[in-house]
Amino acid sequence: MVYLLCPALLLLMSGCESEVFLSGQPEEGNSSDGKVRVEIFARANTYPLPLTKGLEDENTVGMAPWVLVFKGNDANATFIEAAQAFELAGKRYVILTRQPAGSNYRLLILANPQQFFYYGDAVTAYSFTSENFRLNMTPEVTTLSDICSRLLTEPLNAPSCTVIPYSGAGELIPMSYLLTVDKIDNTTKIENTDKSSLQLVRAVAKMVITNKAPNFEFPRL
């Protein structure tokens, strides 16, 4: 059995971050300067096949994903804010600005982010900081579609034919999920409507090829 892991270009989406400090987190059920604490329920989407040989861990979801908030129903939804989640008592939380009912909001969850992102090209690398997000995106102007087409993951440092992406020690696969909610307040939870955890989508595609012939070779994709 031969396992191939093909890197796919992940269109990450991001925006201005409200930096969160543990000392300033509002208690559950309360607000601080219009902010609310929202719990995140998420896990990696399950493969129906065995784990890929060579990967340290292809199912782990880190405890500090980014959550990007957009107002609207579709790709033209406009960016509101972005914040990085934090771990508290073994759970994931994120501090978001309260948003009233009456409109739809799209939450883009970006888990296991890399050290850098690229915006518009693969030349200039930006670390994940609020300042760098503000250099590239404008609240209430930049759309979900804009970010989909411009914000990218780090390019591979070596040809994928010789190095399996995200196979290094402690190197987690970037994952994402797009969720729609009708408000953001202290009752909001980032989960499915049936209360189950979101099944995040990995930034790479996995192909499993089975051939029992002793002389089988798979030349390329």
Spans of features found by a protein language model:
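Bacterial N-terminal signal peptides
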Residues: Y3-S14
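Sec-type signal peptide cleavage vicinity
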Residues: C16-L221
